[in-house]
Amino acid sequence: MDQKVRQFEVCTQDGSVDRHGNPAIRANTGKWLTAILILVNQGLATLAFFGVGVNLVLFLTRVMGQDNAEAANNVSKWTGTVYIFSLLGAFLSDSYWGRYKTCAIFQASFVAGLMMLSLSTGALLLEPSGCGVEDSPCKPHSTFKTVLFYLSVYLIALGYGGYQPNIATFGADQFDAEDSVEGHSKIAFFSYFYLALNLGSLFSNTVLGYFEDQGEWPLGFWASAGSAFAGLVLFLIGTPKYRHFTPRESPWSRFCQVLVAATRKAKIDVHHEELNLYDSETQYTGDKKILHTKGFRFLDRAAIVTPDDEAEKVESGSKYDPWRLCSVTQVEEVKCVLRLLPIWLCTILYSVVFTQMASLFVVQGAAMKTNIKNFRIPASSMSSFDILSVAFFIFAYRRFLDPLFARLNKTERNKGLTELQRMGIGLVIAIMAMISAGIVEIHRLKNKEPESATSISSSSTLSIFWQVPQYMLIGASEVFMYVGQLEFFNSQAPTGLKSFASALCMASISLGNYVSSLLVSIVMKISTTDDVHGWIPENLNKGHLERFYFLLAGLTAADFVVYLICAKWYKYIKSEASFSESVTEEEEV
C-alpha cells in the first residue's frame, strides 16, 4: 500500500510516459519547463508562417500578376489547405507516430518548404530586377516557375498544418490533469498558446510586412525560414524532458467498429430498460471509462451482448469480435464525436469572417491613405491591432473577467463562463466586426480620389487607421471563440482523440477559408454584369465591398441563432472518474 502511495506521489496519474516508455516522473518531466519551450517554439513557427501568409495576397498580385478577387480566393484556398492537413497530422499522431514524432517530422517539412520558397523567389520569380512593389509588377512567369512557387507554398501548408494541432495538444500533455495544480495550468496553457501564436505573428505583421511591402520578398522569406529552423532546434532541445502518451489504435477503426456492430444488430430493441451492455477494462493506463448516456440509442446495439457474441467468444478462445461487440466506452466515444459535430459546424461561418482579415481587409487597407508624412504603412501590418487586441483580452479575461463571472455564477460549479458561452460571445463580436468594416468601406467610398479610376493605390483620402476598430473586434472575438474552442474540444474529446479534437479547430478555419472563397466567387458571379464591375472588383472604388461585409454580418447572425440551439442541446461528456463530482448532465449555455 505504501509503495502505491509513493508511486502516486512520484509519477503522473494521467498515463503519460517519458521518452523511454516508463511512467513519467512528476518532478523530472513536463510542467512549465517544457511547456515554455513549446510556447516559444509556437511563437517562432507562427512568425515564420505569417511571414509568408500575411502578405501572400500582395505577393500574388504584384509578383504573380493576379487580380484582387483571384488573389483573395487563392489565399483562402491555401489557408484552407493548411488546416486540412491538420487532420492528416492528427490522424498520424493519434494512431501511429505519437505527438512528438509527428511534430518533429512536419516541422522539418515546414522548414524545407520555406527554404524552397526563399530560393525560388530570389532566383526565379523577381524578374525583372526590382519588381514586386506596388508600381512595378513582375513580368509573367513560365509554367515551371509557377509550379515551383505553388509546390513550395503547399509544402509549407503541409508542414505547418500537420504540426499545429499536435503541438497544441502536446503542450497540454505536459500537465497532469489528475493533479489539481497541474490541471489548472493545463487549462491556462491554451490561452497562453494562443497568445504565443499571436505574438509570434506580430513581428511578421510589422517588420517583415514592411520589408515585403517594399519589395524585399527574399529577405522576408529567408527570415521566416530562419525562424522556423530555430523553432525546430528549440523543440528538439526539450526532448529529454517531454511527457508523452502512447499512440492508441486508429480512432477511425474504433469508430467504424461501432457503426458496423450496431448495423449488424439493427433488429435488436434498444428501448428496453434492462439492456446487457458490455464494458471492458481500459486498455491504456490513465484512460477513463465513459459513462453510458441515453442519446443516440441506435448505437447502443453495438454494446449489447447477444448469444451469438458469446458463441463466437467460445470459438475464438477468450475475446469478443470487435466488429460485432464494442464496449460502452467505445460506443460513447462515437457519441462524443457526433455531439461535437453540430457545434463544430457552427464555428465554420465564424472562420469565414476571420479569414477576411488576411484577404479583403488587406485589399481594403491598400486602397486607403497609408502615408504618414514620408512613411508608408503596409496594409498587412494593420493586423498588429488584432494581435494587440488578442493579448489584451486574454490578459483581461484571465485576470478580471473570469474571476468576476465566477463570483456572479450562483450554480454549484462556481465557475466562470463555460466554453460554449464564450464561443457564443465570439460570434456576436464577429458580427460587430463585419458591421464596422462595412461602415468603414462606406466612408472610404465617400472619400475616394478622382484619379482612382486609373489606379487603385491610395484611392481614398480616408486614413487606414479607420480600420483599427474592425481589427480590434476580430481580435476580441478570437479570444472568446478560438481559445474557447480549443479548450472545449480538448476537454470533450475522448483520450485517444485529443489531437483530432485540436484538428477540428484547425479544420473549422480550413472550411471557413474554402467557404469564403466560394462565397466570393458566387457574389462576383451574381453581382457582375457587362456594365457593372461587381462587389469586389480590382478597383474597389467601382465596387461595393461594404455589401459583402454586411452579407457576412447577416449570415453570422443566422449562424448564431443556430448555434444557440445546438449549444442548448449539447450534453457534456461524463467519465467514471468524474462521476462522483457534482457534474450535471447538461450545462447552461
From Swiss-Prot:
Chain coiled-coil ranges: none
GO annotation (BP), single: response to cadmium ion
InterPro entries, alphabetized: MFS_trans_sf, POT_fam
Free-text disruption phenotype from the record: No visible phenotype. Higher nitrate concentration in xylem sap and increased cadmium sensitivity. A greater proportion of nitrate accumulates in shoots under cadmium stress.
GO CC annotation terms, alphabetical: plasma membrane
Induction data: Up-regulated by cadmium and nitrate.
Domain of life from the UniProt record: Eukaryota
Residue list for modification Phosphothreonine: T102
Ranges annotated as spanning the membrane: 32-52, 78-98, 105-125, 147-167, 187-207, 217-237, 343-363, 377-397, 423-443, 464-484, 504-524, 548-568
Main localisation: membrane
UniProt subcellular location: Cell membrane
Tissue: Expressed in xylem parenchyma cells within the vasculature. Expressed in siliques and flowers. Higher expression in shoots than in roots.
CDD domains, sorted: MFS_NPF7
Gene3D superfamilies: MFS general substrate transporter like domains (1.20.1250.20)
Signal peptide: none
GO terms of molecular function: nitrate transmembrane transporter activity; symporter activity
Assigned keywords, A-Z: Cell membrane, Membrane, Nitrate assimilation, Phosphoprotein, Symport, Transmembrane, Transmembrane helix, Transport
Its membrane topology: Multi-pass membrane protein
Family that this chain belongs to: Belongs to the major facilitator superfamily. Proton-dependent oligopeptide transporter (POT/PTR) (TC 2.A.17) family.
Physiological role: Low-affinity nitrate transporter. Involved in nitrate removal from xylem sap. Not involved in oligopeptides transport.
Name listed for the protein in its UniProt record: Protein NRT1/ PTR FAMILY 7.2
Organism field: Arabidopsis thaliana
Gene: NPF7.2
